[in-house]
């Protein structure tokens, strides 16, 4: 506790924490050793000053050390967003996950219920009939047998219950909004992470590099989406072979048409589930296109596609052959088995 007091005192001066100091502070918070006042003070001091790459790296390391892990193949990927983009869009990363799985790449999907939108990954999967409250070994079985499994964040990060009330009372974004997507319980080394603000694109790629990721894209749409968008360019920071590159991608690069922002608007969980099922059934739409765009990027990250155009072709084959839909049906069966 004295360590935590000195760390809070350091942050109060505007100084940055080392990776180890951040890990120690967040370990104390998630272990229930910190008081609500200490947690609130530290979180807001970091937020106002702006969290550094080392602070986020240490915080993620602490969160990962406390999570309930899942065994997944070494080539598994995750497609995940921070949420909090305020767009109320359809569930892009969830749909893209089935497309990627149908293309032969195992997916260990990490997600939660809606935080700021009307429908998060967990909400839409539950509406589709997938059982989401599985034990880690059951999720591992889904990934092995179905090529896709869903890890419901609260079930795998029980230590988060110690910071939950403080986060609710603060009612504003904190570093915790960034930690979840970087703390995949299956320990995947290949990720596509969407973020709610352009300012976090490159820093989070650096955090993933620090924590041993092999291949990753961190993305933010120019329209504010925490996905690759089709309304205009998307800002990307990619990690490959230990190098980070920053660039933009456009729908045209992938051979896809642009769409109006309203075309990606979603509804509640049931409405979004119906829309997702229609994509998996092969129906053309802007939703299909944006899901293909994001799946294509994940296939590039996974090393299955050399570029977005090839990724879109592989994704379209996954949809049109029925493979992606078969993955959903299999996941519903195994998760409820």
Swiss-Prot record:
Positions that bind anthranilate 2: 167
Pathway note: Amino-acid biosynthesis; L-tryptophan biosynthesis; L-tryptophan from chorismate: step 2/5
An individual GO BP term: L-tryptophan biosynthetic process
Binding-site list for 5-phospho-alpha-D-ribose 1-diphosphate: 81, 84-85, 89, 91-94, 109-117, 121
Keywords annotated in UniProt: Amino-acid biosynthesis, Aromatic amino acid biosynthesis, Glycosyltransferase, Magnesium, Metal-binding, Transferase, Tryptophan biosynthesis
Any one Gene Ontology molecular-function term assigned to this protein's record: anthranilate phosphoribosyltransferase activity
InterPro entries in the record: Anthranilate_Pribosyl_Tfrase, Glycosyl_Trfase_fam3, Glycosyl_Trfase_fam3_N_dom, Glycosyl_Trfase_fam3_N_dom_sf, Nuc_phospho_transferase
One Pfam family cited in the UniProt record for this chain: Glycos_transf_3
EC number: 2.4.2.18
SUPFAM superfamilies hit by this protein: Nucleoside phosphorylase/phosphoribosyltransferase catalytic domain, Nucleoside phosphorylase/phosphoribosyltransferase N-terminal domain
Binding site for anthranilate 1: 81, 112
Catalytic function, reaction form: N-(5-phospho-beta-D-ribosyl)anthranilate + diphosphate = 5-phospho-alpha-D-ribose 1-diphosphate + anthranilate
Binding site for Mg(2+) 1: 93, 227
UniProt remark on cofactor binding: Binds 2 magnesium ions per monomer.
GO CC term, one of those recorded: cytosol
Cofactor names: Mg(2+)
Positions annotated to bind Mg(2+) 2: 226-227
Coiled-coil positions: none
UniProt similarity note: Belongs to the anthranilate phosphoribosyltransferase family.
Assembly with partners or alone: Homodimer.
General function of this protein: Catalyzes the transfer of the phosphoribosyl group of 5-phosphorylribose-1-pyrophosphate (PRPP) to anthranilate to yield N-(5'-phosphoribosyl)-anthranilate (PRA).
Name of the protein described by the UniProt record: Anthranilate phosphoribosyltransferase
Species whose genome carries this gene: Bradyrhizobium diazoefficiens (strain JCM 10833 / BCRC 13528 / IAM 13628 / NBRC 14792 / USDA 110)
Higher taxonomy: Bacteria, Pseudomonadati, Pseudomonadota, Alphaproteobacteria, Hyphomicrobiales
């Amino acid at each position: 506790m004295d360590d935590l007091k000195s760390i809070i005192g350091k942050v109060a001066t505007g100084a940055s924490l080392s990776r180890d100091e951040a890990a120690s502070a967040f370990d104390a918070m998630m272990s229930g050793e910190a008081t609500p006042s200490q947690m609130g003070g530290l979180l807001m001091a970091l937020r106002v000053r702006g969290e550094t790459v080392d602070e986020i790296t240490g915080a993620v390391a602490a969160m990962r050390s406390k999570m309930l892990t899942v065994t997944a193949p070494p080539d598994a990927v995750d497609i995940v967003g921070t949420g909090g983009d305020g767009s109320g869009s359809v569930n892009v990363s969830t749909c893209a996950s089935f497309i990627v799985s149908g293309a032969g790449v195992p997916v260990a999907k990490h997600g939660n219920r809606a935080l700021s939108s009307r429908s998060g990954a967990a909400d839409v999967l539950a509406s589709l009939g997938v059982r989401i409250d599985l034990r880690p070994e059951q999720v591992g079985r889904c990934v092995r047998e179905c090529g896709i499994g869903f890890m419901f964040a609260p079930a795998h990060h029980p230590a988060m219950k110690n910071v939950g009330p403080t986060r609710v009372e603060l009612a504003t974004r904190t570093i915790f909004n960034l930690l979840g997507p970087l703390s995949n319980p299956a320990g995947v080394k290949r990720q596509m992470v969407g973020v709610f603000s352009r300012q976090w694109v490159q820093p989070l790629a650096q955090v993933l590099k620090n924590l041993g990721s092999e291949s990753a894209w961190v993305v933010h749409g120019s329209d504010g989406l925490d996905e690759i968008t089709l309304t205009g360019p998307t800002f990307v920071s990619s990690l490959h072979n230990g190098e980070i590159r920053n660039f933009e991608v456009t729908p045209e690069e992938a051979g896809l048409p642009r769409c109006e922002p309203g075309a990606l608007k979603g509804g509640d969980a049931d409405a979004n589930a119906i829309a997702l099922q229609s994509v998996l059934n092969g129906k053309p739409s802007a939703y299909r296109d944006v899901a293909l765009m994001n799946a294509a990027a994940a296939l590039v990250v996974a090393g299955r596609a050399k570029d977005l155009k090839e990724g879109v072709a592989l994704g379209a084959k996954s949809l049109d052959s029925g493979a992606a839909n078969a993955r959903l049906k299999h996941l519903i069966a195994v998760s409820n088995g």
